[in-house]
Regions:
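Residue-level recognition of secondary-structure-to-loop junctions
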Residues: 44, 102, 225-229
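Short, solvent-exposed loop/linker segments at the N-terminal edge
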Residues: 43-45, 175-183
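Extracellular acidic, Ser/Thr/Pro-rich low-complexity tracts
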Residues: 56-60, 189-195, 208, 241
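C-terminal edge beta-strand
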Residues: 246-254
Length: 255
């Protein structure tokens, strides 16, 4: 009974806050700015096909939903290519990866309309300046093969799983925490939103170690971990989009 009362009270408080003068306008203002579809560029594949990459940029401070339809459409051809419908704040590259056959003529435009403003991607898709190389090829080609991918629709790829402050060019190769201390794990699981209706999940587990590991919430990418004994542990964060799984392992030294 206490929990139920708390939830209802909290909801009523939010409703009351929304009813204050100017609050509704403030909430609307957080999502009333432009959302732009963006063309990242293309890759020439070895089998003669092309891989196209699309992104988006949102000036809003909260997520915006634009359902597939007149306001979220690819053309020519079918409107629905599996493109994103939820648009997070900021610039998000490689969000819709499309494989097209070698006879592609360069006409494949993504158009978004939000708050009365309509914007579209470039119509000059095959100019040499749009050809991706280096890190762009790696980012676009992650998790799929063009030869076996469906044509003319956004390809589902495994989620991107990372741990902030660990590995790579900027982070250490191991995390350290004193015995009895709590380790803050800043993980993230990012996905392009495919398959439609799928659920993106995260799960931490201990792979090895001299003791036990207790997570504050093992199903949250960002969580706290406690260790029962000193020594070296290996932890794993698994991210799933309900079809594909991706993992990253973290070495932790407890001393």
């Amino acid at each position: 009974m206490t929990t139920r009362t708390f939830v209802v009270t909290g909801l009523m408080a939010v409703i009351a806050w929304m009813a204050l003068p100017g609050m509704t306008n403030l909430v609307v203002a957080q999502s009333s700015f432009s959302v732009y579809p963006v063309y990242d560029g293309f890759i020439n594949n070895s089998d003669g096909t092309l891989t196209l990459s699309f992104a988006y940029f949102s000036h809003n401070r909260e997520a915006v939903t634009i359902p597939i339809g007149p306001d979220n459409v690819f053309s020519p051809g079918p409107r629905n290519r599996g493109q994103p419908e939820m648009f997070l704040p900021g610039h998000h590259r490689w969000q819709c990866i499309v494989v097209v056959d070698e006879d592609f003529d360069g006409d494949f435009v993504w158009t978004l309309t939000h708050r009365g403003e309509t914007t579209s991607t470039s119509t000059s898709m095959l100019q040499y300046s749009w050809e991706l190389d280096g890190s762009g090829v790696v980012a676009v080609g992650r998790g799929f093969t063009p030869e076996s991918s469906p044509r003319n629709t956004c390809v589902n790829r495994p989620p991107i799983v990372r741990v902030l402050g660990y590995g790579g060019r900027r982070g250490p190769d191991e995390l350290r925490v004193p015995v009895g201390g709590e380790l803050k794990l800043f993980g993230s699981v990012r996905d392009e939103g495919l398959p439609k209706g799928g659920m993106v999940t995260a799960e931490w587990r201990m792979v090895s170690g001299p003791g036990t590991t207790t997570f504050a919430d093992a199903t949250s990418a960002r969580t706290l971990a406690n260790f029962s004994a000193s020594g070296t542990y290996e932890l794993e964060l698994l991210g799933s989009d309900s079809v594909f799984d991706e993992t990253i392992r973290v070495t932790v030294v407890v001393e």
